[in-house]
A protein has these predicted regions:
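Metalloprotease/metallohydrolase-associated module, dominated by Zn2+-dependent proteases
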Residues: 7-16, 146-204, 222-266
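Long, contiguous hydrophobic alpha-helical segments, chiefly transmembrane helices and signal peptides
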Residues: 127-130, 135, 155-158, 162-163, ...
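Short alpha-helix carrying the canonical HExxH Zn2+-binding catalytic motif
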Residues: 202-221
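N-terminal low-structure segments adjacent to metalloprotease catalytic domains
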Residues: 1-148, 262-266
Length: 266
């Protein structure tokens, strides 16, 4: 795909995105025009909200089948579209007694929904939509949904909640957190013990991390290739927080192969 324009749709409740800086980052690295637009979900009508609600996941072990949403789910989605800050008040994974308490969406179904809404369907334009909704995809290998930070292709989705929740924390963190919970204790002391080892909500490191996901999306749409196997590359699809921070913060560059591809784009 030969790109001429990239449209970024902001998520204003996450100031760490730094959308203007991202636009400059893209223009510094690629010969494309960049347009910034408001939150994609802000002005959906009732019919569109209902369609979006159909992408919700209520059972992580059941592959998504679009359903007729209940009124309370549609009402929630309508309020969320008007004010995405509501998402921050929903149950987080670490606080959930049951995973069904967490608000989740099928990433591919949401992508289909977004594609149907976008009026600008020119082939040389890439749309990247930020959201604090948690996107997930179904993994056939273990027959369940898993959180995802990014859904590539076009339109692409970057889930800020997915960036926090999808890459796993260390095994030590989970063992200690489970031990605390078994004693009826919170996990704040465990989080403090491991502070800096993983991203947290509204983490100042998000801006740098998001640059890497932007690169992954653009490279996928240019080359058709998914991610990079090397940890020393910003295109690496990190499954652990430590690997994410290593690739995006410590290394913060592309491998030789992908740097050569980037150089040809300028």
């Amino acid at each position: 795909m030969k790109l001429k324009k990239i449209t970024l749709y902001d998520e204003p409740t996450i100031p760490e995105i730094k959308i203007s800086d991202l636009a400059s980052f893209i223009k510094d690295n690629f010969s494309v025009d960049v347009v910034i637009k408001d939150n994609f979900f802000l002005n959906l009508n009732k019919s569109e909200v209902k369609s979006l609600t159909k992408t919700r996941i209520f059972d992580i072990y059941k592959k998504k089948n679009l359903y007729e949403p209940e009124k309370h789910a549609t009402d929630f989605e309508e309020q969320l579209c008007k004010n995405s800050l509501i998402m921050e008040k929903t149950t987080k994974i670490e606080d959930a007694e049951n995973i069904s308490e967490v608000v989740m969406y099928d990433g591919f179904e949401m992508q289909k929904f977004l594609r149907n809404q976008i009026r600008d369907t020119v082939n040389d334009t890439l749309h990247i939509i930020f959201t604090n909704r948690l996107t997930c995809t179904f993994d056939e290998s273990d027959s369940r949904y898993h959180g995802r930070a990014v859904i590539c292709s076009n339109p692409a989705i970057i889930s800020t909640t997915g960036i926090i929740e999808a890459p796993a924390k260390s095994k030590e963190f989970y063992i200690q957190a489970m031990a605390n919970k078994s004693q009826g204790l919170g996990i704040n002391s465990v989080k403090e013990l491991h502070k800096g080892e993983f991203l947290e909500y509204h983490d100042e490191r998000l801006a740098k991390i998001i640059e890497g996901y932007i690169l992954q999306i653009i490279f996928y749409n240019i080359t058709g290739e998914t991610f990079c196997e090397y940890l020393d590359c910003r295109l690496n699809n990190a499954h652990w927080q430590r690997d994410l921070l290593y690739s995006q913060i410590e290394v913060s560059k592309l491998c030789k192969k992908h740097q050569m591809i980037l150089d040809m784009q300028k």
